[in-house]
Amino acid sequence: VKQRKQIKGVNKPLSILEIAYDNIPVNKAKVNYMDIARYITEYVKDTGYTYVLIKGSDSIFEKTGYCYGASGYYAPSSQYGTATDFKHMIKELHNNGIGVIIDFNVAYFGIDIRSIVNYDGGDCYGYLKPRIIEKPQMNITTFAYEKGEVRSFLISAIAMWLDEYNIDGIKITDTATMLYLDYGKNPGEWTPNMYGGNENL
């Protein structure tokens, strides 16, 4: 963390390795965050990457094709260890000169009971009109960004990953879903905005 103030990233080469936990060739039954750190360190040193982009770092409970529904916006996946173990992984990578970026989905969340859907018994984070939010084929729903509690929830989550887990950057995924009401939907599955368009205002 202290080195961040001294490093002028714009004056240095940038090469990012994108990797998902599922693709790491280690024993899946016993893999933990330190195993992942060792593998990434060895691979990056051999190939010359400067950063690693880790996909699916937050807790996820379902994957459908290329997308996933997040359930723990403030917690790393417990499949590979505890939050403390995750911090040790980040520290190990930093000690070896490797920056860490994580995939972070602020476009939608899953509609599984383990997620934040109907968190307060109502639509705290989503919309009241199902056709605006639901993507049946993906089992997900989008955030209602006009709500102050939604903006606070997402901004606070990102700030926590940066401050508490000491990651170096965030990659915002699936921005098209955030911008367009009809993205990934068929006719009749979405509701136009107040002007009759498909933009998510």
Predicted region positions:
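Substrate-binding/active-site clefts of carbohydrate-active enzymes
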Residues: Q3-L14, E18-E199
